């Protein structure tokens, strides 16, 4: 393979702390594997494969990387069979530390459990088991607090407990705990969360960092407002523009005056000095441009007003008073969270289990210690591991968090010895919900030098070997203007765009491969999905459809299997697309993560288990009677029910067996009751997964569902249910009754795993998947659909930022009103900005999956207005 100069820099640079910013499609994995091979086979190198620590994001990636290294070594030994070093490396490949961070932590804990007095027989708990234990622990804890009737707790409960599970006090605890787990010392982090609420005087509040944060954040927001107004100014100055230069200039000067202030009170006063202006437009000007300028000005004033009302409405005295009043609520939330953390840890200890967070924190405890002054230093275990590893390689570094950073730093050489190699792409950091911290990548990106002689250096791989030039140009065009340091954390224009490295047959009509954006006028997703289906029929037409290039540069028409539909979320959306494709005769499969428990086959089998456990349940009993398992008709059930007046359907069946008037129905009832009696006896001594298997086989239900539309997936759904039953047995619960409770708990906790996936490698089928699932993959043709979705809602009753500040509501008991504290309003603003950055990165991932053709769709009820808005938003870029 011919490597680029930049790739060779990655492969050959040694004895440095290296950050590789590897853009989408830049051959990151191939380069990383080549670096490993180069290090362990270089005659001048003394590095063995088991002296490298290679950390990947997924098990599949770790397995693939180890296999690639093995294959490269085997190829090398074929060319040079007498090379003792290569033979040695092949023999050591089994001991190579190429794994996920979770597996690496597990290894540390299992090999050093005695250092932290841990039971060596622990097991990693099933995620569902952890959710169940967590819910039980919180429930028991809150019950204890309710019984104690502590005044501060009761006040908090009154404030936050109304509504659904996700809106009440339990969610507050879980949310704070989840954030804490992304930090190296969760308990310490939680304890410090309420520091801002510990103030007792106005002077303390004025000296806090909060007011400075508000001012700095407002300046960034004002930057954006001024940029929009500058766009309006440019339009006004055009030949046929509305000529509203004086009014816009006056408005911009007023806003600039706000931006100059470095003090909260002065900035608050400056806001009140802004006067709106009327932009009437010059006589004979272009009416469309006049409206465009007026709309921009209106939106700018709306943004300005919202910024003022959210962050500058209150005086310093009023804000301080709210903070002081909120102290008891915040301190109780922290107390509850710390109590939960202890009880949760104790419960896991009793059961001899841990979760992945525990594993990481136990590993950290083994590797790092703290002295009396709070200084952290590596333990003997960490120092020994650091001696063993010649280099640490971290793949997908943009998805690391603080805990992982501390773990890997603790086993690096440190102390002036540079041996950490990090590779990733911050533009593809899309796991903020898992506490990924892209700021770790960005800090190094900003501080590392491109001079490879420096101890800490960075190498940028910007050449994309995946996509056609048309796709690359589209991605660059979009992100040059929307991904900036303020929104996205990185300036895309400044050397972070893609360059085309892929070679495609340029004889294919270029127009076929240009990116297309369609805004569908319609009522909702159904209209958009139908449009997409018809577009797929168009591009797969055997005579006039789109042509793509296969390996070897052979041209052919697009097939269904070349096409992937990407969605931000599959929940409630993928079914609509599946139906639209089916209606248009297009075979499709969705990698769905929702709807599993709603599928008819799963509901039927779970109902059967419920009846086996307790037949006095009319709905599950009626469900299985009219199902293909037993094939009763609704009329037959009506006859059975009408003949005897009984409270329960099961009693009706028992009586009908003896006294029923219809001989045919009587035979069916007897057959069912005998069957049920047999299975109730079996359930006592066989495992639940065996019971499920016998049930679907002996009733012929498995054959029936396999013959239905989507039969393959339905069969796999039942197989997945059996797997859940196996997992249930493994976590020590027993019996049908507890399994039913287990399934109910899964549904209650919103742990719907989605329908079983189907391998479609050899099927000519359109694939539907989430953008997150598509990361790392590539497809000839990509439809990015349902692009109208908004960001996260601002409905959380408690918000937390990365610095450990908690934002809560302040309740006025006298007026019976609730309002967010200034801390909550600021955090909500910051979180919205971070959410926007995450959405940009998700968009980047989606667009860079396409190899040859990219199609983007959305739906709107008012097409004319949408087009007008798009024109306005694109004005800045039209001439560039």
Q: What is the predicted role of each segment?
A:
Residues 1-67, 126-128, 136, 143, ...:
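Conserved motor-region signature of P-loop NTPase helicases/translocases
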Residues 1-21, 31, 51-53, 121, ...:
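Accessory N-terminal region flanking or inserted into the helicase ATPase core
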Residues 15-17, 49, 53-60, 70-264, ...:
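Conserved ATP-dependent motor core of P-loop NTPases, especially the RecA-like helicase ATPase domain
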Residues 32, 107-113, 311-315, 333-338, ...:
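Active-site-adjacent bridging/hinge elements
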Residues 51, 167-354, 455-456, 585-586, ...:
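Conserved ATP-driven helicase/translocase motor core recognized via long
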Residues 93-106, 159-184, 333-339, 357-367, ...:
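Core structural elements
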Residues 653-656, 672-674, 803-804, 820, ...:
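Helicase C-terminal subdomain and adjacent C-terminal extension
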Residues 792-833:
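Conserved catalytic motifs of ABC-family nucleotide-binding domains
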């Amino acid at each position: 393979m011919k490597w680029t100069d930049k790739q060779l820099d990655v492969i050959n640079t040694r004895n440095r702390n290296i950050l590789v910013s590897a853009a989408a499609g830049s051959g990151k994995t191939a380069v990383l594997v080549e670096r490993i091979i180069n290090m362990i086979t270089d005659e001048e190198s003394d590095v063995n494969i088991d002296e490298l620590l290679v950390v990947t994001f997924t098990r599949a990636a770790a397995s693939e990387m180890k296999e690639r290294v093995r294959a490269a070594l085997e190829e090398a030994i074929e060319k040079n069979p007498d090379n003792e070093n290569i033979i040695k490396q092949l023999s050591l490949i089994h001991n190579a530390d190429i794994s996920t961070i979770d597996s690496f932590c597990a290894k540390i804990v299992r090999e050093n459990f005695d250092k932290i007095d841990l039971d060596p027989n622990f097991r990693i708990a099933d995620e569902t088991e952890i959710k169940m234990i967590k819910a039980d622990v919180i429930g028991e804890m809150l019950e204890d607090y309710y019984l104690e009737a502590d005044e501060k707790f009761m006040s908090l409960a009154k404030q936050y407990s109304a509504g659904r599970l996700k809106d009440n006090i339990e969610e507050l605890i879980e949310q704070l705990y989840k954030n804490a787990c992304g930090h190296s010392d969760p308990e310490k982090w939680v304890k410090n969360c309420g520091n801002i609420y510990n103030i007792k005087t106005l002077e303390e509040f004025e000296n806090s960092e909060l007011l400075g944060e508000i001012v700095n954040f407002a300046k960034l927001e004002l930057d954006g407002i001024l940029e929009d107004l500058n766009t309006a100014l440019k339009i006004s100055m055009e030949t046929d523009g509305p000529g509203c230069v004086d009014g816009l200039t006056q408005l911009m000067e007023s806003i600039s005056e706000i931006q100059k202030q470095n003090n909260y009170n002065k900035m608050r006063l400056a806001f009140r000095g802004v006067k709106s202006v009327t932009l009437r437009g010059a006589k004979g000007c272009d009416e469309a441009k006049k409206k465009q300028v007026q709309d921009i000005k209106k939106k700018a004033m709306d943004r300005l007003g919202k910024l003022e009302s959210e962050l500058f409405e209150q005086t310093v005295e009023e804000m301080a008073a709210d903070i002081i009043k909120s102290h008891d609520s915040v301190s109780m939330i922290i107390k509850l969270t710390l109590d939960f953390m202890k009880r949760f840890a104790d419960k896991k200890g009793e059961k001899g289990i841990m979760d992945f967070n525990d594993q990481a924190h136990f590993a950290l405890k083994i590797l790092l210690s703290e002295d009396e002054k709070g200084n952290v230093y590596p333990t003997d275990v960490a120092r020994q591991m650091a001696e063993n590893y010649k280099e640490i390689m971290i793949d997908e570094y943009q998805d690391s968090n603080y805990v992982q950073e501390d773990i890997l730093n603790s086993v690096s050489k440190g102390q002036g010895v540079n041996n950490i190699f990090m590779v990733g792409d911050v533009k593809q950091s899309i796991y903020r919900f898992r506490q990924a911290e892209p700021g770790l990548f960005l800090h190094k990106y900003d501080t590392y030098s491109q001079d490879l002689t420096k101890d800490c250096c960075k190498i940028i791989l910007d050449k994309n070997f995946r996509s056609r030039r048309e796709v690359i140009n589209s991605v660059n065009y979009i992100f040059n203007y929307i991904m900036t340091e303020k929104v996205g954390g990185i300036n895309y224009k400044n050397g972070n765009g893609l360059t085309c490295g892929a070679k495609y047959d340029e004889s294919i009509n270029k127009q076929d491969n240009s990116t297309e954006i369609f805004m569908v006028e319609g009522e909702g997703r159904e209209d958009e999905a139908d449009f997409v289906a018809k577009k797929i029929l168009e591009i797969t037409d055997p005579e006039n459809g789109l042509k793509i290039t296969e390996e070897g540069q052979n041209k052919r028409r697009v097939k269904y299997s070349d096409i992937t539909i990407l969605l931000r979320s599959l929940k409630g959306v993928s079914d609509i697309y599946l139906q639209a494709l089916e209606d248009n005769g297009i075979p499709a499969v969705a990698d769905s993560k929702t709807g599993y428990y709603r599928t008819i086959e799963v509901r039927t089998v779970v109902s059967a288990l419920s009846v086996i456990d307790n037949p006095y349940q009319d709905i599950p009993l009626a469900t299985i009677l009219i199902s293909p398992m037993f094939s009763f008709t609704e009329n037959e059930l009506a006859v059975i029910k009408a003949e005897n007046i009984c409270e329960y359907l099961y009693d009706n069946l028992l009586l009908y067996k003896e006294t029923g008037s219809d001989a045919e129905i009587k035979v069916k009832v007897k057959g069912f009751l005998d069957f049920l009696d047999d299975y109730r006896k079996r359930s006592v001594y066989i495992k639940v997964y065996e019971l499920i298997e016998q049930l679907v086989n002996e009733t012929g239900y498995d054959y029936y569902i396999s013959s239905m539309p989507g039969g393959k997936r339905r069969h796999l759904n039942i197989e997945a249910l059996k797997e859940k039953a196996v997992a249930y047995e493994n976590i020590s619960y027993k019996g049908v009754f507890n399994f039913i409770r287990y399934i109910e708990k899964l549904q209650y906790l919103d742990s719907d795993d989605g329908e079983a996936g189907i391998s479609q490698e050899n099927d000519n089928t359109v694939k539907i998947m989430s953008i997150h699932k598509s990361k790392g993959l590539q497809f000839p043709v990509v439809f990015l659909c349902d692009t109208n979705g908004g960001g996260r809602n601002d409905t959380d009753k408690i918000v937390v930022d990365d610095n450990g500040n908690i934002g809560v509501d302040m309740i006025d008991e006298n007026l019976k009103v609730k309002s967010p504290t200034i801390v909550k309003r600021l955090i909500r603003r910051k979180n919205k900005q971070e959410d926007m950055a995450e959405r940009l990165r998700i968009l980047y991932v989606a667009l860079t999956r396409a190899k040859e053709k990219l199609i983007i769709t959305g739906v709107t009820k008012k097409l004319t207005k949408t087009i007008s808005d798009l024109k306005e938003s694109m004005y800045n870029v039209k001439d560039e």
